[in-house]
């Protein structure tokens, strides 16, 4: 199930690139973020697929003055939510301003910058490991849009339908 994306882009930009990391049948073990005072510049992922580490393409320019690596404790830790802010006005550089990642055990961030000219978003994916990946767009100024994939549960929980025995 595709959720989002949220964000804004510069209508004058001619180099918007769509990206999609939701087709993998793997789990994210690391997230790499380049960011600065203007917001989130790029995002990249490392997946565990078939017992091997696979690095995604970098989505956005590597131009922020700060860089962070989020290391998830695979296979015990998984993403349960993402939230952040994006610039709400049409202008130069209206890209993703901040991101925060929630897992079943921790919270990472916020990374980037916060401000009163930003709109906020939050995707809460529940307590189960239902996260299926990210998608979005970027251009030369940074990450423009971001969204997530949710893998809905496919197995019903067991319900005890047995009747209690009566005692005399």
UniProtKB/Swiss-Prot annotation:
SUPFAM superfamilies: Mannose-binding lectins (SSF51101)
Subcellular location: Cytoplasm
GO biological processes: defense response
Domain annotation Jacalin-type lectin: ranges: 1-152
GO molecular function per UniProt: carbohydrate binding
Keyword ATP-binding: no
CDD domains reported in the protein's UniProt record: Jacalin (cd09612)
Main location, first listed in the record: cytoplasm
GO CC entries: cytoplasm
Top-level taxon in the UniProt lineage: Eukaryota
A Pfam family per the record: Jacalin
UniProtKB keywords: Cytoplasm, Lectin, Plant defense
Signal peptide: none
Sequence similarity: Belongs to the jacalin lectin family.
Quaternary structure and interacting proteins, as annotated: Self-interacts. Interacts with RTM3.
Role this protein plays: Unable to mediate restriction of long-distance movement of the pathogenic tobacco etch virus (TEV) without causing a hypersensitive response or inducing systemic acquired resistance.
Annotated protein name in UniProt: Inactive protein RESTRICTED TEV MOVEMENT 1
Organism: Arabidopsis thaliana (Mouse-ear cress)
């Amino acid at each position: 199930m595709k959720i989002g994306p949220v964000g804004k882009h510069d209508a004058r930009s001619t180099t918007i690139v769509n990206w999609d990391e939701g087709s993998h049948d793997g789990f994210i073990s690391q997230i790499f973020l380049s960011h600065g005072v203007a917001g989130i510049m790029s995002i990249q992922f490392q997946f565990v697929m078939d017992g091997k580490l696979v690095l995604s393409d970098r989505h956005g320019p590597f131009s922020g003055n700060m860089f962070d690596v989020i290391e998830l404790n695979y296979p015990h830790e998984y993403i349960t939510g993402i939230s952040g802010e994006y610039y709400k006005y049409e202008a130069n550089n209206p890209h993703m301003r901040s991101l925060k990642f929630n897992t079943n055990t921790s919270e990472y961030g916020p990374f980037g910058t916060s401000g009163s000219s930003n709109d906020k978003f939050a995707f809460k994916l529940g307590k189960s490991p239902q996260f299926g990946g990210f998608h979005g767009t970027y251009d030369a100024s940074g990450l423009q849009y971001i969204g997530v994939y949710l893998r809905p549960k496919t197995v019903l929980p067991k319900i005890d339908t047995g009747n209690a025995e009566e005692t005399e």
